[in-house]
Amino acid sequence: MSLKAELDAFRSEFMAQVPPEIREAMVRADMELAASGIARRALKAGDRAPDFNLPDARGGHVRLKDLLATGPVVLSFYRGGWCPYCNLELHALQQALPEITRLGAKLVAVSPQTPDESLSTTEKNALSFSVLSDIGSTTAKAFGIAYESCRRIAADLRALRPCFTGEER
């Protein structure tokens, strides 16, 4: 099954099970994100990627410039291990890793999670590629893709739903 099919199936099943106010908040957040213009501001194919130096899940640091010195890099940004959609994407990336490696590229995932949460995500999903922590979303902002979805949804639902970004502490 393709990643799109998995995501669509999950969303249909999930939306059928949640209360209407959660569905409404999620739909509203999706519409706000689409209307925000983020897609127009994000880096495009062929744009120069800004360098970064981020901590990985095992206590090291990874610099994009160093990765690029050895070949192409597939870079995936995700919201965090708390996001079921993101976990489906990470699983699909893990399945694609042998082909990515065969083509001479490296795969790296980036999220606003703390390194401890990134380690948990790595272990839970049995990932064999680097998972980096972009606390404060500095790198995501440099790529033009940062947004505040979790806090907005939590405010809409009047419930604290921690995102494990290190910012709620």
Regions of interest found by a model, annotated:
Residues 89-140:
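Structural microenvironment flanking redox-active thiols in thiol-disulfide oxidoreductases
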